[in-house]
From Swiss-Prot:
One of its GO terms (biological process) is translation. GO terms for molecular function: structural constituent of ribosome. GO terms for cellular component: cytosolic large ribosomal subunit. It holds the Pfam family Ribosomal_L30. Keywords: Ribonucleoprotein, Ribosomal protein. This is Large ribosomal subunit protein uL30. Part of the 50S ribosomal subunit. SUPFAM superfamilies: Ribosomal protein L30p/L7e. Belongs to the universal ribosomal protein uL30 family. Transmembrane segments: none annotated. The keyword tRNA-binding does not apply. The lineage of its organism: Bacteria, Bacillati, Actinomycetota, Actinomycetes, Frankiales. CDD domains: Ribosomal_L30.
C-alpha cells in the first residue's frame, strides 16, 4: 500500500470548524508539521477537505 506524506503549509485559523478538526485528525498541529498516512479512501477524503492547507507527496513504503 502506498504511503502519503502530508505537510501543513497554511494555518487552520479562519477556516471552518470542520477544516480545523480535519487537520487535527490527520495529526497536523503546526505549519510545516508532517505526518505519513496510508493511501486510503478515508485519508483522501480528509485531504480533499483541507487541500488548500496541505501539501501531499507520495513516499516509498
Amino acid at each position: 500500500m502506498a504511503k502519503l506524506r502530508i505537510t501543513q503549509i497554511r494555518s487552520g485559523i479562519g477556516g471552518t470548524r470542520n477544516q480545523r478538526e480535519t487537520l487535527r485528525t490527520l495529526g497536523l498541529r503546526k505549519i510545516n508539521a508532517s505526518t505519513v498516512r496510508d493511501d486510503r479512501p478515508e485519508v483522501l477524503g480528509m485531504i480533499a477537505t483541507v487541500t488548500h492547507l496541505v501539501r501531499v507527496e507520495e513516499v516509498d513504503s
